[in-house]
Every structure is written in structure tokens, then in C-alpha cells.
Amino acid sequence: MSKTLQSFNLLKWIDENKELLKPPVNNKVIWQDSEFIAMILGGPNRRRDFHVDPSDEFFYQIKGECYVECITEEGKREVVTVKEGDVFMLPAMVPHSPHRVANTYGLVIERKRSQGELEDFVWFCDECNHEMHRVRVQLSDIEKQVKEAIHSFNSNKEIRACKNCGHIMPEEVGEWKCE
């Protein structure tokens, strides 16, 4: 989309672009020339990283439900269910892992990062919750860089092995199930 003073039908845009929503993240930025990152995300996604973003993130769930797994200040995992039609404002710096199941769509808006403003992608052990791996990036292309970080983790057995309990996270990630 170019900078215009015209509205468009978002549901039609999703229908016309849904083939671009591919795992592991299933995201597509709507406008490239904005000071915001406004993107559509579809399910099912295939990710288990936790994103630590220096910006607040606004979630609007268009179809189905989204599950945002967060790490609390006490280090506990907590799942926020964002139901169809709901909005959710995730505060900056909260480690979170958004999970989307099949046939779901949501809009996420966050601000573009300033030069030198870094963010992390972190993996925690499924068994003992120990931090296994962290990647710090200067985010400039959210569609490309998140996929690269996930692929790098998934393809390296050494970093998928927990140094605390020995559990080895599988290379492939199945569809997330809310427990």
C-alpha cells in the first residue's frame, strides 16, 4: 500500500493476502511507509520464542482467538486469551510468545524502533523454564528477522539443549494448544 488518504477493507485485504501468512510467524506488514509496524498475523503459527519488545504492542483479534503467553515479573508463565473482537495492549519489555491456531487472524501494531533501540528473542526450556538462548537485534525488517531468529534456534541442536536440565527442545514445533 502506498501513502494515500483512502481507507480500504481490511477483511478483503486479508483474504487477498492470506497466502503470504506462512509459518513460523505468519505475519505480513500492511504499510511499509509508516512510523508504525501494522501487521496482520494468521494461524497456525509455529513459534516458541518470547519477544521482548521496547515498544508497547496493540493486539486486535479479528477472527478466532489468540493466546499471548507472557513471563510475569515473578518469572511465571501466564496466558492472556485475546478473543475475537477483543483488544489487548501489551506493555513494553514484557517477554511474550503469541500463539495462533488455524483459521485465525489478528492485527498487531507496534512502533518502529529507533537506531540503537534493541530487542530480544528468548527461548526458555519447556521442562524447567531456564533461559536457553537469547538473540538481540536492531529490528529493521520484522518479517525477515523474526523468521531468521526462529530458524537459527530450530536448526541448532546445541542451543536447543537446556544446560540446566538436559531437555532437548524438538526442531519442529507443532500447533500450540492452550492448556
UniProtKB/Swiss-Prot annotation:
Enzyme class: oxidoreductase
Superkingdom of source: Bacteria
HAMAP family noted in UniProt: 3_HAO
SUPFAM superfamilies hit by this protein: RmlC-like cupins
Amino acids binding Fe cation 1: 51, 57, 96
One Gene Ontology term of the molecular function aspect: 3-hydroxyanthranilate 3,4-dioxygenase activity
Positions annotated to bind substrate: 57, 100, 110
Alphabetical UniProt keywords: Dioxygenase, Iron, Metal-binding, Oxidoreductase, Pyridine nucleotide biosynthesis
InterPro entries: 3hydroanth_dOase (IPR010329), RmlC-like_jellyroll (IPR014710), RmlC_Cupin_sf (IPR011051)
Homology family: Belongs to the 3-HAO family.
Catalytic activity: 3-hydroxyanthranilate + O2 = (2Z,4Z)-2-amino-3-carboxymuconate 6-semialdehyde
Gene Ontology CC: cytoplasm
Functional description taken from the UniProt entry: Catalyzes the oxidative ring opening of 3-hydroxyanthranilate to 2-amino-3-carboxymuconate semialdehyde, which spontaneously cyclizes to quinolinate.
Biological processes, Gene Ontology terms: anthranilate metabolic process; L-tryptophan catabolic process; NAD biosynthetic process; quinolinate biosynthetic process
Reported cofactor(s): Fe(2+)
Biochemical pathway: Cofactor biosynthesis; NAD(+) biosynthesis; quinolinate from L-kynurenine: step 3/3
Source organism of this protein record: Bacillus thuringiensis (strain Al Hakam)
UniProt name for this protein: 3-hydroxyanthranilate 3,4-dioxygenase
Note on how the cofactor is bound: Binds 2 Fe(2+) ions per subunit.
